[in-house]
Amino acid sequence: MGVAVRTYYASPRHRDDYLESWLELWEGKPGKSALLPGYGWIFGMGDGTCNVGLGILNTSSAFGKTDYKDLLKRWLDNTPDDWAFRSENMIGPVRGAALPMGFNRQPHYERGLLLVGDAGGMINPFNGEGIAYAMESAEIAATAMAEAHGRGPGSPAAERALASYPIKLKAQLGGYYTLGRTFVKLIGHPQVMRVCTRYGLPRRTLMQFTLKLLANLTDAKDGDAMDKLINALSRIAPAA
């Protein structure tokens, strides 16, 4: 489980070419100020504004004990002035939401009810992404419902079609999400995150592997060695 807050700022960075992820949040100068809990992001919307926010996982000791809006302000107040991430440039309020992830809401099917997206805890624990997985689970659910309808609503055959939904869902994402839950437990420890950022970030090949793993960007059929390793780990991991 996680919590995220975000807001929008009028900023010259609105046309940045890339999404920016912050694995460490500092209250001042990096390495010489307080290390804040959580991770952050900045991405330009291309319309004069930037979406800026931070998230905290429940594996962090700060989870549930922190004023997340204040935490966001403390981080952004120490970013460069020309980025314009200041209160006077904020467009709208800071909004927050829970991040149900890694299949933490189950069962996914019970007595005719199928859970998709956030209702079923389907946010990717590796990166906090939820929209794509909501759509993917909805497609699997819709297929099961169509099969059930074709077999005759209320019939035993229809029930079997509906009951196949969580099975197919776990076959598709279960192992990968199990890896993600393990990842979340590890990065909840600041010492682990510090070692990973210090020794991992400078290594391009390792970062390419990390990007594929965290973003779930592997090729299931014709991928390279990295794809095959990640796919193998996902198959081996229990689909719980």
Label the model's feature ranges.
Residues 8-9, 39-43, 75, 103, ...:
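Aromatic side chains
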Residues 146-240:
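C-terminal helical "tail/cap" subdomain of flavin- and related membrane-associated enzymes
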Residues 58-144, 150, 157:
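FAD/FMN-dependent oxidoreductases across multiple families
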Residues 22-29, 86-92, 98-101, 210-218, ...:
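A general structural signal for short secondary-structure boundary/capping elements
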Residues 1-87:
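Predominantly flavin-linked oxidoreductase catalytic cores and closely associated redox partners
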